[in-house]
C-alpha cells in the first residue's frame, strides 16, 4: 500500500527491506536487501543530503533563499538539489566535466546550477571539491540567507 507524504522531505528514507529468496534458501536464514534506489533521488545519498541540510538548518547556517554548494560526482548533488528545491534553496554543484552526461543532464534538469571543471587530483587547487569550497566562501559575503558548503 502506498503512503501519501506531506512533502518531499518525508519521502527520503523508510525504503523497504526486500527478502532475497534465493540467498535466504541457500543460507538457511532470512537475507534482506535494503531498496535505497527507491529514495526520491534514486540513491542512498538522499539520506546523506537530508542529514547535511538538517544539520545546517539546526545550526542556523541557512534559511529560505540560501545557497547550498557541493562538489560531487553526482548522487549527493542530486539529493541536495531535490531537497534544496523543496526548501527554497539554490543549489550549486561543482563536478568534473568527465562525469556521465546522464548525471550532468539530471542535475541541470532538476534545477542545479552546474559548474563543470577539469578533473584534477585532490592535492591540486583545481580539484572540484576545493573549487566548491572556495565558491561557497566567496558567496557567503553576497547572500544574507546563508551559504552552506555541504562537503
Region locations from a protein language model:
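PLP-dependent amino-acid enzyme catalytic core
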Residues: 1-151
Amino acid at each position: 500500500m502506498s503512503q501519501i507524504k506531506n512533502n518531499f522531505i518525508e519521502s527520503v528514507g523508510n525504503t523497504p527491506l526486500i527478502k532475497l529468496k534465493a540467498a535466504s534458501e541457500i543460507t538457511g536464514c532470512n537475507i534482506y536487501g535494503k531498496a535505497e534506489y527507491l529514495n526520491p533521488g534514486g540513491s542512498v545519498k538522499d539520506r546523506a543530503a537530508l542529514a547535511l541540510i538538517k544539520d545546517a538548518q539546526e545550526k542556523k547556517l541557512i534559511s529560505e533563499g540560501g545557497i547550498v554548494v557541493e562538489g560531487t560526482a553526482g548522487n549527493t548533488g542530486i539529493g541536495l538539489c531535490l531537497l534544496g528545491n523543496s526548501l527554497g534553496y539554490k543549489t550549486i554543484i561543482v563536478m568534473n566535466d568527465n562525469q556521465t552526461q546522464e548525471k550532468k543532464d539530471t542535475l541541470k534538469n532538476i534545477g542545479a546550477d552546474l559548474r563543470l571543471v577539469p578533473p584534477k587530483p585532490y592535492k591540486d587547487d583545481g580539484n572540484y571539491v576545493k573549487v566548491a569550497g572556495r565558491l561557497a566562501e566567496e558567496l557567503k559575503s553576497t547572500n544574507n540567507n546563508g551559504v552552506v558548503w555541504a562537503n
